[in-house]
Structure formats: C-alpha cells, structure tokens
C-alpha cells in the first residue's frame, strides 16, 4: 500500500506499507525470537519502494538513526512495515520507519498453526533513516 505525493507536488508525506509473515526458519533464539537485523532488512525493502515511487530509482540507504527495539518480533508474527518521507533534499531523503506486529502466532501442541490478530498493533521497531539518490 502506498500514498502518493501531496497535491502541491512535494513528495514529503509519501508513505509505503508492506506486510510480511515471519517464518519459523528466521527464529534464532529461545521463545522463537527473531534478531533485530530482520526488522532492518524490512526497512530497506520498504525504503526501496518509496525511493522508486518518489525518484524512479532504488536509492542507497546511507544511515539509520535512533533505531529502537521496543517489543519482540517472533516467528509466526505478521508484520506491517511503514516508511514515511519526512524531508526531501536535493539528493537525500529522510524517512521515519516503523515495524508493527499485527498478528501473532500462538502455537500449541494441539494447534501448531494457532494465531490471532492483535486488537491493537504492537510497535516493535522504530528508526529514522537517510536514503541517497545517485546524482
């Protein structure tokens, strides 16, 4: 899902959202926890689509600032990943990024595929980042 630039032609406010199931093959830790790098990879994917929509180029991720891991991501989760363009320079793009858990696997011995949609999305990871568009 994406929201296109404002009517005045400014790309600021452009928003892209992806959803992704976290497979059990990505769990590395007790409790089916997934490492934080998984969220960073998803940020790269959503930022790439935003760059393509705004600039017609995949862009290059230059930096992340203030990455915060606020809640666990687990195998069996369904994640919503969002990038919002908050500032556009000549070649740099400033993004606000967020990973939210929207559904969580709750397997049991009797129901190994059990899961539920969360009443409210759980913010798992936030960051700001800078993407550079080649000149």
Question: In which residue ranges do the predicted regions lie?
Answer:
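Short, functionally important structural connectors and interaction interfaces within domains
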Residues: 20, 25-26, 59, 65, ...
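Compact, glycine-rich, soluble single-domain proteins
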Residues: 30-48, 60-62
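Catalytic strand-loop segment that frames the active site of acyl-thioester-processing enzymes
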Residues: 1-36, 50
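HotDog/MaoC-like acyl-thioester-processing domains
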Residues: 6-11, 74-75, 84-135
């Amino acid at each position: 899902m994406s929201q296109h630039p404002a009517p005045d032609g400014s790309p600021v406010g452009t928003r892209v959202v992806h959803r992704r199931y976290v497979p059990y093959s990505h769990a590395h830790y007790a409790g089916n926890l997934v490492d934080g790098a998984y969220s960073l990879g998803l940020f790269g994917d959503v930022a790439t689509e935003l760059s393509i929509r705004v600039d017609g180029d995949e862009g290059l991720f230059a930096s992340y600032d203030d990455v915060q891991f606020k809640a666990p991501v687990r195998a069996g989760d369904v994640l919503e990943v969002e990038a919002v363009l908050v500032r556009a320079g000549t070649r740099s793009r400033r993004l606000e990024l967020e990973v939210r858990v929207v559904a969580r696997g709750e397997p049991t011995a009797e129901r190994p595929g059990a899961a539920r949609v969360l009443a409210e999305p759980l913010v798992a990871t936030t960051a700001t980042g800078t993407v550079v568009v080649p000149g």
